């Protein structure tokens, strides 16, 4: 591999240096702006793609079943592994799949005008 490196180094030293002052000409201002916008959009697209693939999170399940004894209750999202007494207070004593409408006191209900 060192012989290949020496060959490349010899070729680079044999080639005359390029001058930056010799060019094909300046671009028009509108062309420079167009190129700048295109480069910016490509960089933004790359940033979005990296963010999309790098920062993926597992979706939270919408509904889970927790079995206690022989009775299955729905578990609220975010209360995984913890007992939620909020859902238990809505259960009806007449039917296992029915819920009670518990009247709320007027002071405890928060509402905003639309």
Curated annotation (Swiss-Prot):
InterPro entries xref list: PDZK1IP1/SMIM24 (IPR031627)
Membrane topology: Single-pass membrane protein
Membrane-crossing residue ranges in chain numbering: 29-51
Topology feature Cytoplasmic, residues: 52-114
UniProt xrefs under Pfam families: MAP17
GO cellular component: apical plasma membrane
Region: Disordered, residue numbers: 95-114
Keyword Chaperone among record annotations: no
Parts forming coiled coils: none
Modified residue annotations for Phosphoserine: 85
Keywords: Cell membrane, Membrane, Phosphoprotein, Transmembrane, Transmembrane helix
Topological region Extracellular: 1-28
Subcellular location: Apical cell membrane
Basic and acidic residues composition bias: residue spans: 105-114
Subunit: Forms a heterodimer (via N-terminal transmembrane helix) with SLC5A2/SGLT2 (via TM13); this interaction enhances SLC5A2 transporter activity. Interacts with PDZK1.
Function noted in UniProt: Auxiliary protein of electrogenic Na(+)-coupled sugar symporter SLC5A2/SGLT2 and SLC5A1/SGLT1. Essential for the transporter activity of SLC5A2/SGLT2 but not SLC5A1/SGLT1.
Similarity remark: Belongs to the PDZK1-interacting protein 1/SMIM24 family.
Name of the molecule in the record: PDZK1-interacting protein 1
Organism (species): Pongo abelii
